[in-house]
Swiss-Prot record:
The keyword Flavoprotein does not apply. One of the components of the core complex of photosystem II (PSII). PSII is a light-driven water:plastoquinone oxidoreductase that uses light energy to abstract electrons from H(2)O, generating O(2) and a proton gradient subsequently used for ATP formation. It consists of a core antenna complex that captures photons, and an electron transfer chain that converts photonic excitation into a charge separation. This subunit is found at the monomer-monomer interface and is required for correct PSII assembly and/or dimerization. It is found in: Plastid membrane. The gene is psbL. It comes from Aneura mirabilis (Parasitic liverwort). SUPFAM superfamilies: Photosystem II reaction center protein L, PsbL (SSF161017). This is Photosystem II reaction center protein L. InterPro entries: PSII_PsbL (IPR003372), PSII_PsbL_sf (IPR037266). The keyword Plastid applies. PSII is composed of 1 copy each of membrane proteins PsbA, PsbB, PsbC, PsbD, PsbE, PsbF, PsbH, PsbI, PsbJ, PsbK, PsbL, PsbM, PsbT, PsbX, PsbY, PsbZ, Psb30/Ycf12, at least 3 peripheral proteins of the oxygen-evolving complex and a large number of cofactors. It forms dimeric complexes. Belongs to the PsbL family. The chain crosses the membrane at residues 17-37. It holds the Pfam family PsbL.
Length: 38
């Protein structure tokens, strides 16, 4: 219970993966919109 490092690392990794997921969804949305509007 006196080891905040692993918990902090886990939260940081989760936040990073969430940002990568949002970026991937954004890129896919842009590519699909370009495909449909052309």
């Amino acid at each position: 219970m006196t080891q905040p490092n692993p918990n902090k690392q886990s939260v940081e990794l989760n936040r990073t993966s969430l940002y990568w997921g949002l970026l991937l969804i954004f890129v896919l949305a842009v590519s699909f919109s370009n495909y449909f509007f052309n």
